[in-house]
């Protein structure tokens, strides 16, 4: 996969898989990278680490909620303005709300079912919004192509965007 000189967005970038992927994209010489996470402190630390090593502002930190559409649009707008059209997106943000689907209260003997709102939140972050971050990239590539006068995609153009 060609990474050099492409612009990337990584959600969940402050830790774990997102952080490791962001560092690898930078090692592979991504042109610019948007780092996205709820945890602002570790996110800024990572951006500072990347930018210091690169000697330029390669990494742009964005602290916010990946399920917020306005936030997603702002990340893509600012990243595109600073580095160009995003061609790689890594929707690595995820949350874990572990518990049994049904628990029996030891004292009362009553069943407690996993809260629907918590389940919805997990689905929103882990399943639904990664698709929206990918579609945002695809839409912006399509607009960029149209603005450059390109119509149909041709196989010899190779890959236009990558979702990891």
Mark where each language-model region is.
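Catalytic Tyr-X3-Lys loop
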Residues: 95, 108-134
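Conserved glycine-rich Rossmann-like NAD(P)H-binding loop of the short-chain dehydrogenase/reductase
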Residues: 29-45
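Amphipathic alpha-helical dimer-interface segment in Rossmann-like NAD(P)H-dependent oxidoreductases
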Residues: 124-157
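Flexible N-terminal pre-Rossmann segment of NAD(P)-dependent oxidoreductases
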Residues: 1-9, 27, 110-112, 148-159
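Conserved catalytic-site loops of classical short-chain dehydrogenases/reductases
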Residues: 87-88, 97, 120, 147-164
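Canonical Rossmann dinucleotide-binding motif of NAD(H)/NADP(H)-dependent dehydrogenases/reductases
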Residues: 2-34
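The beta1-alpha1 cofactor-binding region of Rossmann-like NAD(H)/NADP(H)-dependent oxidoreductases
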Residues: 40-41, 63-74, 116
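Rossmann-fold scaffold of SDR-type NAD(P)-dependent oxidoreductases
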Residues: 11, 86-97, 102-103, 126, ...
């Amino acid at each position: 996969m060609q990474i050099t000189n492409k612009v990337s967005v990584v959600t969940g970038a402050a830790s774990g898989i997102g952080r490791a992927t962001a560092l690898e994209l930078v090692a592979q010489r991504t042109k610019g990278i948007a780092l996205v996470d709820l945890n602002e402190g570790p996110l800024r630390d990572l951006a500072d680490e990347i930018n210091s090593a690169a000697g330029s502002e390669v990494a742009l930190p964005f602290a916010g909620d990946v399920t917020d559409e306005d936030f997603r649009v702002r990340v893509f707008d600012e990243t595109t303005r600073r580095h160009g059209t995003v061609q790689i997106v890594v929707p690595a943000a995820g949350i874990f709300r572990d518990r049994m689907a049904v628990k029996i209260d030891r004292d009362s003997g009553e069943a407690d079912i996993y809260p629907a709102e918590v389940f919805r939140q997990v689905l929103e972050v882990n399943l639904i919004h990664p698709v929206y971050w990918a579609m945002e990239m695809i839409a912006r590539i399509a607009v960029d192509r149209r603005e450059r006068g390109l119509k149909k995609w041709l196989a010899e153009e190779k890959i236009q965007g990558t979702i990891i």
